[in-house]
Regions:
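Non-catalytic N-terminal targeting/anchoring module and adjacent flexible stem/linker
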Residues: 1-14
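SAM cofactor-binding core of SAM-dependent methyltransferases
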Residues: 14-86
């Protein structure tokens, strides 16, 4: 979970998940709904995810690939039916 202070100095939860705010940066280039993604190295499906924002807020579907068994199981648990996890 990421948090930030808004203009009123209140703490709010961010709707973005990616490390270094990559999802924020690429949104201006991928500014459409119902897209498709492929994410390699999906981790647990939430932390440092480059695709979760697009799935959760822009109705994208896609494929997540995670080679570490423990993270793979977390990813399957954490992501919706809109994503296929391998």
């Amino acid at each position: 979970m990421k948090f930030f202070k808004n203009k009123k100095n209140e703490i709010q939860e961010s709707k973005y998940f990616s490390i270094n705010e990559i999802d924020i940066k690429i949104e201006k280039y991928l500014d459409f709904d119902n897209g498709f993604f492929v994410e390699l190295g999906a981790n647990d499906g939430v932390n440092q995810s480059n695709s979760l924002y697009f799935e959760k807020y822009r109705n994208w579907k896609g494929v997540l690939v995670e080679p570490i068994p423990h993270n793979y199981l977390l990813c399957k648990k954490n992501r919706s039916l809109n994503s296929k996890v391998f």
